[in-house]
Amino acid sequence: MGIKFLEVIKPFCAVLPEIQKPERKIQFREKVLWTAITLFIFLVCCQIPLFGIMSSDSADPFYWMRVILASNRGTLMELGISPIVTSGLIMQLLAGAKIIGVGDTPKDRALFNGAQKLFGMIITIGQAIVYVMTGMYGDPSEMGAGICLLIIIQLFVAGLIVLLLDELLQKGYGLGSGISLFIATNICETIVWKAFSPTTVNTGRGTEFEGAIIALFHLLATRTDKVRALREGFYRQNLPNLMNLIATVFVFAVVIYFQGFRVDLPIKSARYRGQYNTYPIKLFYTSNIPIILQSALVSNLYVISQMLSTRFSGNFLVNLLGTWSDATSGGPARAYPVAGLCYYLSPPESFGSVLDDPVHAGIYIVFMLGSCAFFSKTWIEVSGSSAKDVAKQLKEQQMVMRGHRETSMVHELNRYIPTAAAFGGLCIGGLSVMADFLGAIGSGTGILLAVTIIYQYFEIFVKEQSEVGSMGALLF
């Protein structure tokens, strides 16, 4: 059934826009250039407003997810990477549940990737329609069918651009992946902005600067009670404070520390005697994939809940899924869940919120740990990184594990890889929860994604450096 499904969509995959694989080895300088161009296009799209929208000042239901999904409200990047990640989530779940089968052949892998792209385009259209019809840009009946269609087309084209930019990097023209690059850029931009933003916000305490560091100096300069000003700079509510910055730096350090945890399996050449090496199995074996998929799951649940809440407010089942409220203090207008399933799957705002509602905190912890472990373990089966796949790669390189026969390699690798994947996903979820409870800027999930992505790029640079010889040779 699985292979038949991939064969059915094969004609559709053939007409999809595609980036061709490079016919030659791309030099590092070219990769840096293409990566910079990709990032520039993304940042430009983040600043171009959608043409035809009547208003985008209403409460933002996806405010808490925008940092993670690399989206910017009211612009071409309204959807961000959500369609790509959602299609990946759907395909992974279908493959993990054996509803569709993905073979080990390059043909099946290519069809699987094509199906993922096709679903990404379909989801882009679906999300664009939902955004327009739920009134995020104004009343659809007042805007008219033509303007609504124009906004949907803009969102679809922007989503297609994101798909192709991601594919451009993944095909080897650039460094890393587009998804990772866009997420890391968005999160780092948010952290810097929350620290140094010169924007003023009118609070009950008077006019204050949004940036935590600028606000501290402003408070010390304008308040007569310096001790109180210092305390307010560290602990002020509803706006970024220095404790949030300290928590962010602390989480960065902890995640970097855990990045170094790994088990080195001794391997040797089956052809040449005396040639030994190691195969590293990292604690974060699936890197940030679990948290990205978990974010996609929650964001789509938010979309569905918001859509139903707008249309069928007061319905018991709709309220069971999520009840929403608007908040305008301490920043832009935003909607947040106050009851229902969406509330319990959203992170507590601070450690004080954990003490106020321990049931919420407990359910959130269980959900984060369980979903990250599940996604991590199922991802290895569809991404070519399971014990069977690793054993096949080692066999192709004519390498075997020391002290084990070639036929027993899969069994031995199965002792480590699934455990590392599940436990690594569990740790990823745990670190994200810790960051949320400490109040880190950009959310626990965002900080975790930023650190793991930056670390991935550091490893890419080190690898390229070892291949070329020196960083100077890489860049000049």
UniProtKB/Swiss-Prot annotation:
GO CC annotations on file: endoplasmic reticulum membrane
Keyword check for Transport, yes or no.
Answer: yes
| Keyword terms, alphabetized | Developmental protein, Endoplasmic reticulum, Membrane, Protein transport, Translocation, Transmembrane, Transmembrane helix, Transport
Stretches of the chain found on the membrane's Lumenal side: 54-76, 139-144, 194-240, 310-354, 442-445
Write out the topological domains of type Cytoplasmic. Answer: 2-33, 97-117, 166-172, 262-288, 376-420, 463-476
- Residue ranges spanning the membrane: these are 34-53, 77-96, 118-138, 145-165, 173-193, 241-261, 289-309, 355-375, 421-441, 446-462
What disulfide bonds does the UniProt entry report for this chain?
Answer: none
What subcellular compartments does it reside in? Endoplasmic reticulum membrane
Q: How does it sit in the membrane?
A: Multi-pass membrane protein
Task: Tell me which InterPro entries the record gives.
Answer: SecY/SEC61-alpha, SecY_CS, SecY_dom_sf, Translocon_Sec61/SecY_plug_dom
**What superkingdom does the record give?**
Eukaryota
Biological processes per GO annotation:
pronephric nephron development; protein targeting to ER; protein transport
Task: Assign the protein's first listed, main location to one coarse class.
Answer: endoplasmic reticulum
Family statement: Belongs to the SecY/SEC61-alpha family.
The entry describes its oligomerization and partners as:
The SEC61 channel-forming translocon complex consists of channel-forming core components SEC61A1, SEC61B and SEC61G and different auxiliary components such as SEC62 and SEC63. The SEC61 channel associates with the multi-pass translocon (MPT) complex.
Q: What does this protein do?
A: Component of SEC61 channel-forming translocon complex that mediates transport of signal peptide-containing precursor polypeptides across the endoplasmic reticulum (ER). Forms a ribosome receptor and a gated pore in the ER membrane, both functions required for cotranslational translocation of nascent polypeptides. May cooperate with auxiliary protein SEC62, SEC63 and HSPA5/BiP to enable post-translational transport of small presecretory proteins.
Protein name according to UniProt: Protein transport protein Sec61 subunit alpha
Name the species this protein comes from: Hemitripterus americanus
